Amino acid sequence: MSQLFYKGEALLLPQTLHIRHLGQQDYQTVWHAMQAYTDNRGADSQDELWIVEHTPVFTQGQAGKSEHILNPGDIPVIQVDRGGQVTYHGPGQLVAYPLIDIKRAKLGVRQLVNHIEQSIIDMLSPYDIKAYAKTDAPGVYVDERKIASLGLRIRKGCSFHGLALNVDMDLAPFRRINPCGYAGLEMVQSKALNGPQSVVEAGDKLIDTFTKTLGYQEVIHHQGLAE
């Protein structure tokens, strides 16, 4: 985080968050891209938020146990390097990957998780959806049903992986797993709660609350991954 000095006092430069709109992508392409971005970051690298929908896939986090994958069928299962256990991604789900230099921002991992959860809660609140987080089970819930999942990885003081918000999707594949390691955990989506009706709508709302919660002063939008 760079500073200017004015009359001997340190002034914080406005922070910029770069938003990458990736459309629908297969999981591994985006996973490898965010690994590469994190590995190649320098002290002056910009923070980014990647917005994407994935083709159907189960991802198994580092804490995952095989017994929580009940019947994957024709949906691929990928072992990944994020925290947490197994979850499902598919069309109609908003996935957002915050690539944040948390060391530079002086953010702890728990603080970042809290900020992400609060961003989701705040975006749902105007729709009169009473969402909340749990201290013992990361994510966001509505009436004990899970609407958003979280799983992060920190490398070189920078975050990657992120959140998945159910918007307007087929929830049936969640029944092929124990979501996040919890047998019988019921999932819910925003469309059924009269919340955001599309991934585009949900993405726009999340970008707004995320930037406000994290304190970014400027947002720059990009289409697709960087060349």
UniProtKB/Swiss-Prot annotation:
Keywords: Acyltransferase, Cytoplasm, Transferase. Pathway: Protein modification; protein lipoylation via endogenous pathway; protein N(6)-(lipoyl)lysine from octanoyl-[acyl-carrier-protein]: step 1/2. It catalyses: octanoyl-[ACP] + L-lysyl-[protein] = N(6)-octanoyl-L-lysyl-[protein] + holo-[ACP] + H(+). PROSITE patterns: BPL_LPL_CATALYTIC, LIPB. It is found in: Cytoplasm. GO terms for cellular component: cytoplasm. Residues 43-218 form the BPL/LPL catalytic domain. The keyword Plastid does not apply. Substrate binds at residues 82-89, 149-151, 162-164. The record marks 146 as: Lowers pKa of active site Cys. GO terms for biological process: protein modification process. One of its GO terms (molecular function) is lipoyl(octanoyl) transferase activity. Gene3D superfamilies: Bira Bifunctional Protein, Domain 2. Its EC number is 2.3.1.181. The active site is at 180 (acyl-thioester intermediate). Pfam families: LplA-B_cat (PF21948). PANTHER family: LIPOYLTRANSFERASE 2, MITOCHONDRIAL-RELATED (PTHR10993:SF7), OCTANOYLTRANSFERASE (PTHR10993). NCBIfam families: lipB, PRK14342.1. Belongs to the LipB family. HAMAP family: LipB. Catalyzes the transfer of endogenously produced octanoic acid from octanoyl-acyl-carrier-protein onto the lipoyl domains of lipoate-dependent enzymes. Lipoyl-ACP can also act as a substrate although octanoyl-ACP is likely to be the physiological substrate. In the reaction, the free carboxyl group of octanoic acid is attached via an amide linkage to the epsilon-amino group of a specific lysine residue of lipoyl domains of lipoate-dependent enzymes. This is Octanoyltransferase. It comes from Shewanella denitrificans (strain OS217 / ATCC BAA-1090 / DSM 15013). The lineage of its organism: Bacteria, Pseudomonadati, Pseudomonadota, Gammaproteobacteria, Alteromonadales.
